[in-house]
Amino acid sequence: MKRTKKDIYKAYGIEFKGNKLYCDPLNMWINPLLTIGTNTKIGNAATWSIYHGNEMLNISDFGPKTAAIMAAANITEIKGSCPCHCDGCYCDSGRYCFDNVKAGNMLKLILARLYTDWTRRAISAQIEADDIMQIRIHAAGDFFSHEYVGMWYDIVSKFGKVIFWTYTKYEYALDKFETCLNFFITPSITPAGFNFGTCAELLYKYNKLTKLGYKVHICACGTTMQNHCADCKHGCKAVGIECDFVLFIKHSSRTYKAGKNDPIEFAAVCDIIAQQNN
């Protein structure tokens, strides 16, 4: 008999009712920790965000929702998650400025910093219960400690067919996840999505995904060094190509042109495209 979500969460020692989790550390009911969206092309995709920046965050600086979360944890201040605070950080503007978003990210920062084991169990239970197949870690925030990296290492290792990806400035994380085939980690240099990248980034992703047994198709439209095909995110599958992932060469920009900046990697990508079209 198929297990219910309640059964799965119970196996991880967490009470689940009405799509809410009972958070023992804070004595409150909360939403599942991963936000499920549609930003990828296979299965259920999810994101994990924690409060960004590297300054000390004080309860007096926040609105009522965020302040209530901090009060529930019996803290008046907590350090942000990033190794540094970048000029022009996108988390300083837009939707990240709404108090409900700040409250959600603060909640997860508190849980990750102070209650790491509970957070690991809650995330693991949700991956299993919601059949999540791809996770972007840190839509906001970054790795902040060896223990926190270890939490994600345990999760990534447990779910070997789930794809995890992120950007980071935390060097320990780059080394820790080196042997995890299902974890794609890039130094924080470009704000690209998982399916887009330079030729070198595409080769890295292509090799790891194929080793995991996924069928990967690289779209040829980027090899012309012109504009991508119309709606190329979905175009390849629309013409009947069956695959798990479609990868695309990064659009040409002022600083990057496929084939000019990276002729060796570009040639290797073109070879793969030629072979897949035979």
Residue positions per predicted region:
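Class I S-adenosyl-L-methionine
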Residues: 1-278
